Amino acid sequence: MKIPFFIQEFTQEMENAVLDTLRNEQFVGGESVSKFEDEFAKYIGTKYAVSVSSGNGALHLSLFALGLSDNSKIITPTNSFIASANCIRMINAKPILCDIHYEDGNIDMNSVNDSADAIIPVHIYGNPCDFDSVRIFAEEHKIPIIEDACQAHGAEYKNKKVGSISDVGCFSFYPTKNRSEEHTSELQSRAYL
């Protein structure tokens, strides 16, 4: 039996929109991108959204925007796509890997003993992490939270969409994610970075 990795389902309306964009707009950016950014920001519940090339790019850009750099210590869980830790190394910062909850695969803040300059919790497999424990830790240490919501489009934590409940939320639309749009990603923010 052949089991597809993902199923491509395109409506005629979707195909027409792609062709219209290719024929009438610039290849990168343009009216469709601006419209998507605005609509996705409204959907998530943030004021700002910026399209970038990948989830890794969104995470990387968020670290720069928050002023993190060499020798910053940034907490992230062990159970994630490599981009969560790679973006930290890309700015010459130190990833502090922490354990996860066995039950849901998300970050276990009880395993964090180190102080840090930021934290990147990951909402894994569309399942929000225990964000209250993340927020308490961040507030106690006065550090920013960058949500890796690359696998959690539309997931909610206490009636709020993930990606909107921290300083910055990062999403990926890679074809293997639970929501795909060619190869683009979004960086969400409540404040102008």
Model-assigned labels for residue ranges:
Residues E182-L193:
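Single conserved hydrophobic/aromatic residue that forms the stacking wall/gate
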Residues F64-A149, E156:
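PLP-dependent aminotransferase-like
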Residues S51, T76, N178:
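Conserved SAM-binding loop
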Residues Q26-K73, C87-I91, L97-D99, K160:
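Phosphate-binding glycine-rich loop
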Residues E147-S180:
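Conserved active-site segment immediately N-terminal to the catalytic lysine
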Residues M1-Q26, E31:
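N-terminal "arm"/small-domain region of PLP-dependent enzymes with the aminotransferase-like
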